[in-house]
């Protein structure tokens, strides 16, 4: 898929590192980790942030490791690695149903929400780590308090995305607060991360490899973050969209050994997965791809082995092909997590209880949605789209359905968690800023809150005073939660969710020129019930 010219012009500025501005050899600040020795780079725009841009946490998943669980990366020796640009992303695939939406890049804001198609590889199981300079220097005898850690899991429908998304880079946030560390994780996507292959299923092998990648990355953080000045006992897992599903679902998968102490789920939750998990018995998608790769007509075991030897270039061409070029989009390839009742479950609603073997209700969750989620999933180029203030009637059912599903499953989960005695805080984001939502009808679309939290909201143009205030407050709120998941937001006046939805309260962000305001969930609950959603 081609990228817009503006993206091509901007990406080198964002992805390539400026020359180091520290008056020393950064090798003196190198950190010895379980997967190698890494020296930081310092950018002119964020001079007090030590950026470790390209750290592998797993072996390259090629050959026999393609379509297999990730293998921990081992320290290769004494060489110091000093990288000056972000890692190449995992191979991308934009499904047919998202072609023609803002996710397809017709406007720059939409383009900046997904990864760089031109720079992808299977050698992508990397993290990018951003820490205050002072925390990295602690090993020189300048003691600092261990910092809370936020591990970011990107969205993108398990098909696109990565670290190299300008809206989703954490340096500005860390530069401003100097009080936390952010680790951004890449994981395998689409056919390579979620291969519903019969050859795997027959042997009882896991089909949700991308989720196993995420877990291995969390283990890497636990084992290494203290060396960067981070607190391994204060790790919060944060994700949005598919990343929101992943981090919320993580609690169910790793209930007996979660490692993390808090979860932030933006516009995604485990209960919403119940309606979109794939059928573990339907292997036609993988076999169709295999046929296109010259591996058709084989027994399942042989099909899998053949696909493990397909050149990476061929896979990239197939997955990233434009419509009409005989690629995955033309084959109608769909990507979904598979309910195996090990990493993904089909009964999340039933599993939320006080039974810690099934669900760790002791881990607090901050969860929320946006007021116009569905604007991101409808065809954008309708008549008059450049000046319209709302969607045309024929597109509203699709947009409303997408948004209501997120809103109502979120309300349902907050109720179930409250019944289980779990600490839960809920937000509703309503921000509408022209440098993020340049078309009048977009509003607070799916992902629109992220530039505020990351502090990248000026990527597309200057901000307003209110937008800057909003960004700083959201950054502080997320950090308050990560610093003390049980009580941090409560100290800021946030109410905990209650077991009776009509009595529960949540916090509305960026609505009516107000930074935050507490309001009743009853109106949202009523809207769900009127549209047939159980909360």
From Swiss-Prot:
Keywords (A to Z) from UniProt: Glycoprotein, Hydrolase, Lipid degradation, Lipid metabolism, Secreted, Signal
Enzyme class (EC, first level): hydrolase
Induction: Transcript accumulation reached its highest level in 4 hour old cultures.
Thermal dependence of catalysis: Optimum temperature is 35 to 38 degrees Celsius.
Reactions mediated catalytically: a carboxylic ester + H2O = an alcohol + a carboxylate + H(+)
pH-related activity note: Optimum pH is 7.0.
Active site, per annotation: 241
Glycosylation sites: 32, 119, 282, 341, 347, 432
GO BP field: lipid catabolic process
EC number from the UniProt entry: 3.1.1.1
Localization: Secreted
Annotated GO MF terms: hydrolase activity
Signal peptide: 1-17
Domain of life from the UniProt record: Eukaryota
Cellular-component GO terms for this entry: extracellular region
InterPro entries in UniProt: AB_hydrolase_fold, CarbesteraseB, Carboxylesterase_B_AS, Type-B_Carboxylest/Lipase
Stored PANTHER family: CARBOXYLESTERASE
Family that this chain belongs to: Belongs to the type-B carboxylesterase/lipase family.
Protein purpose: Secreted lipase involved in plant virulence. Has a substrate preference for p-nitrophenyl esters with a carbon chain length of C8 (p-nitrophenyl caprylate).
Protein name: Secreted lipase 5
């Amino acid at each position: 898929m081609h990228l817009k010219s503006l993206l091509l012009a901007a990406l080198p500025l964002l992805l390539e590192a400026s020359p180091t501005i520290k008056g020393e050899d950064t090798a003196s600040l190198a950190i010895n980790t379980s997967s190698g020795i890494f020296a930081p780079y310092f950018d002119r725009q964020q001079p007090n942030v030590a950026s470790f841009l390209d750290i592998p946490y797993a072996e390259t998943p090629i050959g026999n490791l393609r379509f297999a669980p990730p293998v921990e990366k081992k320290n290769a020796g004494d060489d110091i690695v000093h990288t000056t640009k972000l890692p190449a992303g995992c191979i991308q695939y934009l499904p047919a149903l998202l072609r023609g939406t803002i996710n397809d890049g017709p406007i720059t804001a939409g383009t900046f929400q997904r990864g760089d198609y031109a720079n992808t590889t299977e050698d992508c199981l990397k993290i990018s780590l951003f820490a205050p300079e002072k925390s990295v220097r602690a090993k020189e005898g300048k003691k600092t308090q261990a910092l809370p850690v936020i591990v970011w899991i990107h969205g993108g429908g398990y098909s696109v995305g990565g670290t190299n998304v300008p809206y989703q880079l954490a340096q500005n946030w860390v530069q401003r607060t100097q009080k936390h560390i952010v680790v951004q994780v890449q994981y395998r996507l689409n056919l390579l991360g979620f291969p519903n292959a019969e050859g795997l299923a027959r042997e009882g092998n896991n089909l949700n490899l991308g989720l196993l990648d995420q877990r291995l990355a969390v283990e890497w953080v636990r084992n290494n973050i203290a060396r960067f000045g981070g607190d391994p006992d204060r790790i919060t897992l944060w994700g949005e969209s598919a990343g929101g599903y992943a981090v919320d679902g993580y609690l169910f998968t790793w209930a007996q050994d979660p490692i993390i102490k808090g979860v932030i789920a933006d516009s995604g939750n485990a209960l919403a997965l119940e309606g979109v998990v794939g059928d573990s018995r339907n292997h036609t998608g993988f076999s169709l791809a295999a046929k296109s790769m010259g591996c058709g007509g084989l027994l399942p075991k042989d099909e899998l082995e053949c696909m493990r030897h397909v050149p990476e270039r061929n896979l990239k061409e197939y997955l990233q092909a434009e419509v009409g070029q005989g690629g995955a989009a033309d084959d109608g390839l769909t990507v979904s997590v598979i309910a195996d009742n090990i990493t993904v479950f089909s009964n999340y609603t039933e599993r939320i209880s006080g039974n810690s073997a099934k669900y760790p209700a002791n881990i607090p969750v901050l969860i929320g949605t946006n007021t116009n989620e569905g604007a991101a999933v409808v065809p954008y180029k309708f008549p008059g789209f450049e000046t319209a203030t709302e969607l045309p009637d024929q597109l509203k059912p699709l947009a409303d359905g997408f948004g209501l599903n997120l809103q109502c499953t979120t309300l349902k989960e907050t109720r179930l968690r409250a019944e289980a005695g779990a600490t839960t805080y809920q937000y509703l984001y309503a921000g509408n800023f022209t440098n993020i939502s340049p078309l009048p009808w977009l509003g607070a679309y799916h992902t629109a809150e992220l530039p505020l939290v990351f502090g990248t909201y000026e990527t597309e143009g200057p901000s307003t005073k209110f937008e800057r205030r909003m960004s700083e407050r959201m950054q502080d709120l997320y950090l308050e939660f990560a610093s003390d998941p049980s009580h941090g937001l409560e100290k800021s006046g946030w109410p905990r969710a209650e077991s009776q939805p009509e009595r529960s309260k949540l916090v509305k962000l960026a609505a009516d020129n107000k930074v935050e305001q507490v309001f009743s969930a009853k109106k949202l609950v009523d809207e769900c019930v009127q549209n047939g959603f159980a909360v």
